[in-house]
Amino acid sequence: LLFSTFKGSGYDIACCDVNHPIIYNKMGNSICINKANFNPPFIENLFLIYLGKKQNTQTSIENYSKSQFNKVESIKKINRICDEFLKCNDLIHFEELIQEHESIISKAISINPIQKSTFIGYKDGKIKSLGSWGGDFILVTTKNKDLTYFRNRGLNTIIPLKEMVYLG
């Protein structure tokens, strides 16, 4: 029903049915869901920050569908990055992966990465857009766990990632 009406990936629905991190792959109308182990040694340096700018998911999907880019090559790169995310034991490398992922998605949807457009002054780590890019939450890395930069911008809902996700 989802694929024929909303055209979404189904990822959010898949997440509702599990109590652990997953790797989600969609090829046409086929989906593959695998359990993922994600509990890096730098988990204390990862935070979710609520932006309160819910995006229209349907509009985002329509814009993505119209975009012109090498989808096959981009998917290969993103799959490699995802594999590296799961194996990553170093915050600096994790941040490099975030930047690479943001760059690929930015080109695909013709939107600047949020760190370059909205949070250009943030220098203590990297920022990863989540969901429909620029909506409800961002993932933030920080080397010294000081998130004053975001609080000074009125973003006070800051949740340590380890409190929000099941790390099992």
Predicted regions span which residues?
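C-terminal nucleotide
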Residues: 2-7, 11-132, 139-168
